[in-house]
């Protein structure tokens, strides 16, 4: 089933590229498609992410911005990425040297977006990410209702099974559903669209039983709240910017109603949710298979970390530690990354990985008041349990988080910016230049 989804995904992307390049507004269309590709997992051509290929094609299109002021971010990012990738040549336990090339390709793709993305490009990319996340969630709901054939995971965890959507496993579905929840809440949408997008992603975020996504969402909300308090305490009182609140109350009401109906119709679901939430607090129980596996893997990674030289064991070395903590020293292991991105990168690169780790965390915190910054924070927290740092989504969010703070210096003020957004139009996810706060 996974191969079928990947095949359909690859064919759809290729056909979409052909259609986009013949579209009158092909730059906006390809920007949207770039956001869609960032929401896919494992769609590659000769081990090159479709996201990277589309970024190169997108660079060749006319138009866009010239964001010269972003170079101060790209220089440290490029240095950190090259330093970490160099461990593929130095490490003694490198499992797949091509992972270094994939990383450099993703960083290069992010650099392209940073240097050339305009406000409208960024908006289109976020829309593409929202659409593909919601499609994945919709497929997950159809799997739960048996309308799409699939093998539901972990019936011992959930009485109705854990859907996978268009992704290889439920944890990834949960992460992308969380991305969809944040985007549908923050972006300006018509009331009906906000309800549909929010409800679809929220329901799947719950039904996927992905604890990493739950923790990440709560952690992101707490950091956003802390940032808001700090900002108000350190800045003069001014006109308060109101976000796109249209439809939020309706979305909350729909989520409450749908939850009540689901819990009433399937009483076992309530017990499953309570038990799943309880496993996030306190000691991991013996029957918590995924929790026990994560503990064993982290223990093995810690043991491996005790022996790292200054440049680590080499990028992808952490992948030699299996899901249950077994260490595969000979041959090529199936995985190339660890579940915990920070611990895995330390095993891979040790001090050579620290600059990249520090850059990602710092960028997420500095941009926590923007939409891309909040999404990046969510993905990084989730990646402490299910590593998505080597996925395109992390790097498009890195690029958009950088440009979220630089946008006002990059492109001329357009007539739309000076006159306001026309009635019925969807506002940009970034504030106009006169704004005193990030969205």
Label for each model-derived stretch:
Residues 1-64, 83-89, 379-381:
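N-terminal signal-anchor transmembrane segment
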Residues 41-52, 93-99, 170-171, 195-235, ...:
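Helix-loop-helix junctions and helix-breaking kinks within/between transmembrane helices
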Residues 56-59, 221, 367-439:
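Transmembrane alpha-helices of multi-pass inner-membrane enzymes
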Residues 71-84, 92-115, 133:
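Aromatic-anchored transmembrane helix interface
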Residues 126-154, 158, 165-231:
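Alpha-helical transmembrane segments of multi-pass inner-membrane proteins
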Residues 152, 163, 282-352:
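Long extracytoplasmic/lumenal interhelical loops at the membrane interface
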Residues 159-162, 236-249, 259-298, 320:
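Flexible juxtamembrane loops connecting transmembrane helices in multi-pass membrane enzymes
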Residues 342-380:
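Hydrophobic transmembrane alpha-helices and their immediate junctions
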């Amino acid at each position: 089933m996974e191969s079928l989804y990947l095949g359909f995904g690859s064919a759809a992307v290729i056909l979409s590229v052909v259609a986009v390049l013949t579209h009158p507004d092909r730059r906006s269309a390809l920007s949207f498609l770039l956001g869609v590709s960032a929401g896919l997992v494992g769609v590659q051509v000769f081990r090159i992410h479709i996201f990277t290929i589309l970024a190169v094609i997108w660079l060749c299109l006319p138009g866009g911005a010239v964001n010269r002021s972003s170079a101060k971010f790209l220089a440290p990012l490029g240095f950190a990425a090259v330093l970490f990738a160099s461990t593929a040549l130095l490490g003694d336990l490198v499992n797949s040297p091509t992972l270094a090339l994939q990383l450099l390709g993703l960083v290069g793709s992010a650099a392209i977006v940073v240097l050339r993305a305009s406000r409208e490009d960024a908006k289109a990319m976020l829309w593409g990410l929202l659409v593909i996340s919601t499609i994945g969630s919709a497929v997950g709901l159809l799997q739960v209702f048996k309308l799409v054939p699939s093998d539901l995971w972990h019936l011992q965890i959930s009485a109705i099974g854990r859907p996978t959507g268009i992704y290889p496993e439920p944890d990834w579905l949960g992460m992308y559903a969380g991305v969809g929840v944040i985007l549908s809440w923050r972006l300006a949408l018509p009331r009906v669209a906000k309800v549909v997008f929010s409800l679809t992603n929220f329901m799947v975020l719950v039904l996927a039983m992905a604890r990493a996504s739950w923790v990440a969402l709560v952690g992101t909300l707490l950091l956003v709240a802390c940032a808001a308090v700090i900002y108000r305490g350190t800045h003069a009182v001014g006109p308060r910017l109101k976000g796109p609140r249209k439809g939020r109350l309706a979305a909350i009401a729909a989520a409450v109603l749908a939850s009540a109906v689901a819990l009433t119709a399937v009483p076992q679901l309530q017990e499953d949710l309570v038990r799943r939430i309880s496993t996030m607090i306190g000691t991991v129980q013996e029957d918590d298979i995924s929790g026990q596996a994560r503990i064993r893997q982290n223990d093995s990674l810690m043991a491996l970390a005790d022996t790292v030289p200054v440049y680590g064991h080499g990028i992808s070395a952490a992948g030699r530690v299996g899901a249950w903590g077994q260490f595969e020293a000979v041959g090529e292991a199936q995985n190339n990354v660890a579940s915990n991105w920070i611990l895995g990168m330390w095993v891979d690169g040790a001090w050579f990985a620290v600059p990249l780790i520090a850059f990602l965390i710092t960028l997420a915190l500095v941009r926590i008041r923007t939409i891309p910054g909040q999404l990046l924070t969510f993905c990084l927290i989730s990646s402490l349990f299910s590593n998505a740092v080597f996925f395109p989504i992390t790097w498009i969010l890195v690029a958009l988080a950088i440009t979220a703070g630089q946008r006002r210096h990059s492109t001329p003020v357009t007539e739309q910016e000076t006159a306001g957004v026309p009635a019925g139009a969807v506002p940009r996810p970034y504030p106009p230049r006169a704004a005193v706060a990030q969205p």
